[in-house]
Amino acid sequence: MFFSFYHSSFSSLSSFFFSFFSLLLYMLVLLQIFPKNYYEAGTLSIRVIRKNTFNHSYNNIKNIHYIHCGYPNIFNNCRNYYMNNFYNNNLSAPFKNKNNYMHIFFKIVEGNKKKKREHPFFKYLFHMNMLEKSGDKKNTVISKITESCQYGDIRKYMNMKKESLEEGEKNKSGEEYNKHVEQNNIKDEKIHFKDGTFIKSKEEEIENEKGGTICLKKEIQKNVLEINNNTYNNDTKYLSNPKGVTNKSKQSKKEIEKKKKKKNNNNNNNNNNKIKSEKSANDTKNIPPIPKNTEDRWNDYNKIKEYAKISNVYLGAHISASGGVQNAPINSFNISGLAFALFLKNQRKWESAALTNENIKQFEENCKKYNFDKNFILPHGSYLINLANPDKEKRDKSYLSFLDDIKRCEQLNIKLYNFHPGSTVGQCTVDEGIKNVADCINKVHKETNNVIIVLENSAGQKNSVGSKFEHLRDIINLVHDKDRIGVCLDTCHTFAAGYNIKTFENFDNVMKQFDDIVNVKYLKAVHLNDSKSDIGSGLDRHENIGKGKLTMDTFKYIMKSKYFKNIPIILETPDITNDESIYKYEIQNLYKLYFEK
């Protein structure tokens, strides 16, 4: 009896010690595998499509990725478990009530809770890019990554997501799914990614949450697009940043409000840009492109030339000289321009490469090839030039650029050169600014031979010189060689400076005023622009013909008036077509105005 009792007690005791040491050993193993503080309370959200499309989610959505934190076996088990259960639609505890979810939530519990062993491998699931995001404290999950997780590796994956997945990565995932389809005899078409878009040969119809039907392909594409653009539903939870990375929830209210305001401003700007782009698309809808066929371009050019012979009005545009000044005549021919303006060098730099002999030779050849009269070529001066500046050092710098431009005109045998008189920069009177401009013109006349300097009237900006006809007159009066000075009237600038040119009668009165003050013999060119701003605004805002504050009578007057015959009339309107075809369209319509009664 005693032996039996002893045997029983010993057996129980040994069983107890065996269990105890086994449990202790097991715990030690666990502690080795899962370091201290490895678990934390929270929820990890992974974006999927719907119950009906679970079979496609892993490969199609491409936002579920696994980051190996140091334990390959657990990592692989985790991945396999997830893949198998997901594909077979046999989802256990964390996936209950899946019928109504667009998101599946993986539960991760604290290590000191009873259910600490519940799906430990989900610790290895990370949504790419989620580590960069954090919400308020309620939504913050997995607030720190332990030493066992290599933050650098995670960062690398995050950057992959941020930069968008490589095409090879997408195709690899597609192949993985296709392999799964074959192995499991799933009755479905294979899939692949192309240019970031999910492609499927058959567009299945599935029932959506509202009871309607939706195209599977479109549903998947929508989700892929949302993920690539980092846009998620409000119920999506985000992983917070690892230790050492700033948590948004800890930011001050001021910073949060500031960021919200900035975001709203960006949204407004995006909306404005969208409206502008839509408006631009509507504006350009009826504008024909420049013909690709050279013969067609010659036919269009010859028509315009006939109109010019009848009207004695020579229209053109400020065109691109990209690739060299020799390309300007070609570009002008393409838009059927009989006159043109160009920059002889970079208009926003003080120094530019000199013209080569080849540039000069080809420019001459192209002018002859396309029958350009050099009296109708009007180069535009650099925007940096300010001859009215009272600061001698700065004015001398402007003068050297001014002189360089005019010498380039002489190299190309061009007769006219147009520039803005400049600004007093608020440091001298307008009269002093006028004298500075005239002194520079007199000086450049002595250093060059025959180029006519053409003063462009300004729009009336603060401290500007040249917005009033009297300014132009006073500069001319101070210039010694009157044969080498002239004026270019810009219609937008004239209107913005306060001269009413909206009707035939008003424009005619303005031109009589110009003749009385300046003398019409000095009118050497016109810049033809509509105006975005109203009369007297002082704003230099060019607009396409018929789209601004001026009227078609303004432009009809230009076409018919005696004041604008046999001088270059240059369009400087916005190139809304981005290929200069707008200028051809405007030139053709302007000649039509001449023939209207």
Curated annotation (Swiss-Prot):
Binding site for Mn(2+): 493, 540, 542
CDD domains registered for this protein in UniProt: AP2Ec
Modulation of this protein's activity: Apurinic/apyrimidinic (AP) endonuclease activity is enhanced with increasing concentrations of Mn(2+), while Zn(2+) initially enhances activity but subsequently inhibits activity in a concentration-dependent manner. Co(2+) inhibits apurinic/apyrimidinic (AP) endonuclease activity at concentrations greater than 2.5 mM.
Cofactor: Zn(2+); Mn(2+)
Gene Ontology molecular function: any one: phosphoric diester hydrolase activity
Organism: Plasmodium falciparum (isolate 3D7)
Protein name in UniProt: Apurinic-apyrimidinic endonuclease 1
Binding note for cofactor: Binds 2 Zn(2+) and 1 Mn(2+) ions.
Lineage, opening ranks: Eukaryota, Sar, Alveolata, Apicomplexa, Aconoidasida
Annotated Low complexity bias: 265-274
EC code: 3.1.21.-
Binding site for Zn(2+) 2: 456, 490, 527, 572
Subcellular location: Mitochondrion
Biased composition (Polar residues): 232-246
